[in-house]
Amino acid sequence: MVFLLCFFLVADVSYGINGDCELPKVVGPCRGGFRRYYYNSSSKRCEKFIYGGCRGNANNFHTLEECEKVCGVRSRDSPKEN
């Protein structure tokens, strides 16, 4: 049982990006204005956006490095401005 769990975890990391990274960018209805990064599945890059502070989703990272690490982005190109 443990073997199967480990196998599926490794397969998920090896053959696809984190499912949270496929979620759409959500600014949210609040007006906080926090600089965050999200994975854009169309451009296959982590991009900067302004987060309102509430009702976001898991595709919301404090740093570019965190976004790239979680979402498996290999290139270190400058983030796209939105």
UniProtKB/Swiss-Prot annotation:
GO MF term list: potassium channel regulator activity; serine-type endopeptidase inhibitor activity; toxin activity
Keyword Transit peptide among record annotations: no
PROSITE patterns, per the entry: BPTI_KUNITZ_1 (PS00280), BPTI_KUNITZ_2 (PS50279)
SS bond list: C21-C71, C30-C54, C46-C67
Name of the protein described by the UniProt record: U-actitoxin-Avd3m
Organism: Anemonia viridis (Snakelocks anemone)
Function: Serine protease inhibitor that inhibits both tissue and plasma kallikreins. Has hemolytic activity. Inhibits voltage-gated potassium channels (Kv).
Domain BPTI/Kunitz inhibitor: 21-71
Pro-piece positions: 76-82
Primary location: secreted
